[in-house]
């Protein structure tokens, strides 16, 4: 007889093979066609808000794994909060101005930006940005990320630009905007100033040189020293030879000792502590010290520039250290921030002998016309020829490069517009402490950055961006910016966008009758610089959070990569504090970078770049989403094909757990078949307790943004509590009991609750799979169209906190583990095949024996053996013996029983199975 026809075997349309790459697009269509995101919002419309403000990715190129990690983490936050009942509108955004897009357009059109019509050029830049917004939008949606994709914010939106102008105006009104000559990062390739956030450091090999500056006025300090007519030189050390034409001073430290060292034919001055190192590096064996002076004694000594007709003044500066070089610092105020500041104190003028394109000017003398990098060799040759070159050393150092063109940048003093961070630094630091930083070290990182940072250079010498809304009087050159001019420009931009600045005449951009407040002239010129793109995105909180009814300022969270401490987190904080006196966010959460399987940075040259779509097209977006939580995302995340393949195995275990649960609930309707808590079998109550503990821990992990913990908890629950234990034990009563028996319905009641809860717990992470499971639950208590329209699972506190139940089942599982080892030995010795082939004898004494006897039936069920006997033992430790089971094997349930075949119809089944088939 085919007994399988009498069993309640699993039935489900939920496939074992996920085929995520093929199946996921169906769920994308389902979510879109049924407006699931909008329905999520509608469901929670009157509840507390949770607003995550999206940091705008740059609209050029396809998304990379860093983008994917970022957007998936945001999606996890939002979906969890929504399931918890929060109202979670999410407005994706794009950063659309700036250098990278300009460069792409120049490359595409093959034009010189200085010769092209600005309005036409800006039009091409806009088209380029919009085309990539469309591409990236589809790519982000493919990840399963929910949001207002058809109504995002863009920094090129006229309303955004108008709000940005008003933010600028508010800062100017408070005195935080000024124009000044200062050294800034300058990219000669891109011909523009750069912000610190636009700088990337790379390891460069270069030459450092030791240069002698002849002392021509010692202030009488050396008069009483017997120098034998030898010349005295102060030795400086530099890694940027090309800046020597800009040298105007030599900085010493007030408190350091400086030695006059006789090296035979001349006297050299270096910091006393560095004498030995400097002499060794420059291969000088014979030397002795003549005298020592404090740095402060040498102040105002004058030296002759080694190749220009100019003097270099000895000055004092706290920035001088003994970490490298000679303790005597080459000082060029046009090429360094500290140089600029220290020279300012001495009223030393600033010269900048390098032009916008990086070529040396007439102020560099015979080196004029050379590209700054090419001048290094020529200057070194000149120094050697004139006997001013003491030595050369090859070094490796971290040097700043342009974030976009990847070429080295220089420090160059130019007239730029700045936001005076000094003006509101204390407020900004206080605002940092009002924010929750996750991880906690983020607080110290941004605090120190703001405490130490200089004023923010906000002007750029480019075309594609929001113009700096300032005018200059043609007569007296006074800058003009007032409430009226800002309001007038903002209103124009709101209607026409910032293109109006380039297409309209000055008179149209100014309120009628505008006069210079100084000289009364009515003729003006426009500022030609645009704003730093970090000012664009840094103003997003003002536009996005305040202009949309369903959002609020400040928002709850910013979530970006940890490079944004010096980028968006900081620019947003600065504009917010300057205009509103507080941070625009309550929580800042950061993640690390994506690196390859060996922990190396991904780069095209290394050939180790993995696209998110390499993974999605082969394994599915849910596997990529699982990867996002598979490690501690607050540090760098490794990825490789091997890592992804390992994750598919973990995913399969979660999926198979869901499939088993679904397959055994095909005939269970919770509305009619549910068993009350008081009537549940004890093993089912234990399983519920395990579920409730899982819900409690997973909820805590989600609340703490510890998604890696969620991943481990869910995986362990599926494998250890479910597959290896509860579900395996349940198979017999699920398949072999009467379909409507209390025994089976008790199991189904709990399995239904486990399935529903598990589906919700994984939904923020495995969104596609959770939706697929939800759609395959035939009968549901919650009549929700989508898993994302349900509520977070709740726990039964009585069961959760039932310590007696927990202690009892901990003992039972301990016994199971001991027995399992002996069963494995018996299996290896070919005594048994399946555990049902066995009879187990447990030898125990005292309380443990009594415990096993009292719970013999439960323990036998848990052990999945045909017979269990308990006998008196002689040790405190239980002893286990395994035998072949007594009786015959039931052909229906495969248990051994001495009563198999002893029934009216002589069927080879056990008494339990006979009762079932007899009825059938």
Swiss-Prot record:
Q: What are the recorded GO MF terms, alphabetically?
A: aminoacyl-tRNA deacylase activity; ATP binding; isoleucine-tRNA ligase activity; tRNA binding; zinc ion binding
Subcellular location per UniProt equals:
Cytoplasm
Where on this chain does Zn(2+) bind? 890, 893, 910, 913
Residue positions binding ATP: 604
Q: Name one Pfam family in it.
A: tRNA-synt_1
Lineage of origin: Bacteria, Bacillati, Bacillota, Bacillota incertae sedis, Caldicellulosiruptorales
Where is the motif named 'HIGH' region mapped on this chain? 57-67
According to the record, how does the cofactor bind?
Binds 1 zinc ion per subunit.
Query: How does the entry describe the domains?
Result: IleRS has two distinct active sites: one for aminoacylation and one for editing. The misactivated valine is translocated from the active site to the editing site, which sterically excludes the correctly activated isoleucine. The single editing site contains two valyl binding pockets, one specific for each substrate (Val-AMP or Val-tRNA(Ile)).
The answer to whether keyword Lipid biosynthesis applies is: no
Q: Where is the secretion signal located?
A: none
Q: Provide the protein name.
A: Isoleucine--tRNA ligase
Reactions that this protein is recorded to catalyse: tRNA(Ile) + L-isoleucine + ATP = L-isoleucyl-tRNA(Ile) + AMP + diphosphate
Amino acids binding L-isoleucyl-5'-AMP: 560
Q: Self-association or partners: how does it assemble?
A: Monomer.
InterPro entries per the record?
aa-tRNA-synth_I_CS (IPR001412), aa-tRNA-synth_Ia (IPR002300), Anticodon_Ile_BEm (IPR033708), Ile-tRNA-ligase (IPR002301), Ile-tRNA-ligase_type1 (IPR023585), Ile-tRNA_ligase (IPR050081), M/V/L/I-tRNA-synth_anticd-bd (IPR013155), Rossmann-like_a/b/a_fold (IPR014729)
Q: What is its EC number?
A: 6.1.1.5
What's its job? Catalyzes the attachment of isoleucine to tRNA(Ile). As IleRS can inadvertently accommodate and process structurally similar amino acids such as valine, to avoid such errors it has two additional distinct tRNA(Ile)-dependent editing activities. One activity is designated as 'pretransfer' editing and involves the hydrolysis of activated Val-AMP. The other activity is designated 'posttransfer' editing and involves deacylation of mischarged Val-tRNA(Ile).
Q: Name one GO cellular component term.
A: cytosol
Provide the alphabetized UniProt keywords: Aminoacyl-tRNA synthetase, ATP-binding, Cytoplasm, Ligase, Metal-binding, Nucleotide-binding, Protein biosynthesis, Zinc
Q: Which family does it belong to?
A: Belongs to the class-I aminoacyl-tRNA synthetase family. IleS type 1 subfamily.
Q: Which coenzyme or cofactor does it need?
A: Zn(2+)
Q: Which Gene3D superfamilies match?
A: 1.10.730.20, HUPs (3.40.50.620), Ile-tRNA synthetase CP2 domain-like (1.10.10.830)
| Keyword presence, 4Fe-4S | no
Q: Give the primary localization class.
A: cytoplasm
Per UniProt, the short sequence motif 'KMSKS' region occupies residue numbers 601-605
The protein's matches in SUPFAM superfamilies, at most eight in alphabetical order, are given as: Anticodon-binding domain of a subclass of class I aminoacyl-tRNA synthetases, Nucleotidylyl transferase, ValRS/IleRS/LeuRS editing domain
């Amino acid at each position: 007889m085919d007994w399988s026809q009498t069993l309640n075997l699993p039935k489900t349309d939920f496939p074992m093979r996920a085929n995520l790459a093929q199946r996921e697009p169906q769920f994308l269509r389902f979510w879109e066609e049924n407006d699931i995101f909008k329905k999520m919002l509608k469901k929670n419309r009157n509840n507390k808000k949770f607003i995550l403000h999206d940091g705008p990715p740059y609209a050029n190129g396809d998304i990379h794994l860093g983008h994917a990690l970022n957007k998936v983490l945001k999606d996890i936050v939002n979906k969890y909060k929504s399931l918890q009942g929060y109202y979670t509108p999410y407005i994706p955004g794009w950063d659309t101005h700036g250098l990278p897009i300009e460069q792409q357009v120049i490359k595409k059109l093959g034009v010189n930006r200085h010769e092209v019509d600005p309005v036409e050029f800006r039009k091409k830049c806009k088209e380029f940005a919009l085309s990539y917004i469309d591409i990236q939008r589809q790519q982000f949606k493919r990840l399963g990320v929910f949001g207002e994709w058809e109504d995002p914010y863009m920094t090129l939106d006229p309303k955004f630009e108008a709000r940005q102008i008003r933010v600028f105006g508010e800062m100017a009104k408070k005195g935080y905007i000024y124009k000044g000559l200062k050294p800034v990062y300058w990219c000669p390739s891109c011909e523009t100033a750069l912000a610190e956030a636009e700088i990337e450091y790379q390891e460069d090999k270069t030459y450092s040189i030791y240069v002698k500056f002849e002392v021509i006025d010692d202030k009488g300090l050396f008069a009483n020293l017997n120098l034998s007519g030898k010349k005295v030189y102060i030795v400086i050390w530099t890694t940027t030879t090309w800046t020597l034409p800009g040298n105007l001073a030599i900085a010493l430290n007030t408190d350091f000792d400086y030695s006059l060292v006789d090296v035979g034919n001349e006297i050299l001055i270096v910091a006393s502590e560095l004498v030995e190192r400097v002499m060794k590096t420059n291969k000088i064996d014979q030397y002795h010290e003549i005298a020592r002076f404090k740095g402060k004694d040498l102040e105002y000594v004058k030296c002759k520039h080694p190749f220009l007709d100019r003097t270099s003044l000895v000055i004092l500066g706290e920035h001088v250290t003994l970490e490298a070089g000679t303790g005597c610092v080459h000082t060029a105020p046009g090429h360094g921030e500290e140089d600029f500041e220290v020279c300012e104190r001495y009223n030393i003028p600033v010269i900048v002998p390098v032009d916008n394109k990086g070529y040396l000017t007439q102020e560099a003398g015979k080196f004029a016309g050379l590209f700054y990098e090419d001048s290094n060799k020529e200057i070194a040759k000149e120094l050697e020829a004139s006997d001013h070159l003491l030595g050369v050393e090859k070094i490796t150092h971290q040097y700043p490069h342009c974030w976009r063109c990847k070429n080295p940048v220089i420090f160059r003093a130019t007239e730029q517009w700045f936001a005076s961070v000094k003006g509101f630094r204390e407020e900004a630091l206080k605002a940092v402490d009002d924010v929750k930083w996750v991880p906690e070290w983020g607080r110290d990182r941004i605090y120190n950055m703001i405490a130490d940072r200089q004023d923010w250079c906000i002007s750029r010498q480019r075309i594609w961006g929001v113009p700096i809304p300032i005018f200059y009087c043609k007569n007296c050159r006074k800058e003009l910016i007032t409430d009226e001019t800002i309001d007038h420009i903002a209103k124009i931009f709101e209607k026409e966008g910032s293109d109006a600045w380039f297409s309209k005449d000055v008179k149209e951009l100014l309120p009628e009758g505008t006069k210079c407040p100084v000289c009364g002239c009515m003729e003006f010129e426009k500022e030609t610089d645009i704003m730093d793109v970090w000012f664009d995105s840094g103003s997003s909180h003002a536009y996005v959070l305040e202009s949309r009814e369903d959002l609020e300022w400040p928002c709850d969270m910013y979530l970006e990569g940890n490079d944004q401490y010096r980028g968006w987190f900081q620019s947003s904080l600065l504009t917010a504090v300057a205009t509103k006196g507080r941070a625009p966010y309550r929580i800042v959460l950061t993640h690390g970078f994506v690196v390859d399987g060996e922990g190396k940075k991904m780069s095209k040259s290394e050939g180790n770049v993995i696209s998110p779509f390499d993974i999605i097209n082969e394994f599915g977006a849910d596997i990529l989403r699982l990867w996002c939580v598979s490690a501690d995302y607050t540090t760098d995340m490794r990825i490789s094909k091997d890592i992804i393949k390992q994750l598919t195995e973990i995913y399969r275990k979660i999926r198979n757990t869901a499939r088993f649960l679904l397959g055994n609930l095909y005939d269970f309707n919770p509305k009619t078949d549910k068993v009350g808590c008081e009537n549940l079998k004890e093993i089912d109550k234990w399983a519920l307790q395990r579920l409730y503990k899982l819900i409690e821990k997973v909820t805590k992990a989600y609340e703490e943004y510890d998604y890696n913990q969620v991943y481990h908890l869910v995986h362990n629950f599926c494998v250890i509590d479910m597959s290896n234990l509860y579900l395996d034990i349940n198979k017999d009563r699920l398949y072999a009991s009467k379909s409507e028996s209390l025994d089976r319905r008790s199991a189904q009641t709990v399995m239904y609750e486990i399935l529903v809860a598990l589906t919700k717990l994984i939904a923020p992470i495995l969104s596609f799979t959770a939706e697929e499971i939800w759609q395959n639950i035939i009968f549901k208590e919650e009549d929700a169209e989508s898993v994302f329209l349900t509520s977070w699972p709740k726990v039964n506190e009585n069961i959760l906190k039932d310590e007696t139940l927990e202690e009892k089942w901990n003992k039972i599982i301990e016994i199971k583990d001991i027995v399992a080892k002996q069963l494995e030995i018996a299996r290896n010795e070919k005594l048994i095949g399946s555990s049902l082939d066995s009879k187990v004898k447990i030898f125990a004494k005292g309380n443990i024996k009594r415990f096993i006897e009292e719970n013999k039936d439960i323990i036998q069920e848990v052990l999945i053996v045909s017979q269990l006997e308990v006998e008196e033992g002689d040790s405190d430790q239980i002893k286990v013996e395994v035998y072949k089971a007594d009786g015959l094997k039931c052909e229906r349930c495969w248990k051994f029983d001495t009563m198999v075949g002893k029934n009216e119809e002589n069927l080879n089944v056990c008494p339990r199975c006979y009762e079932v088939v007899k009825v059938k």
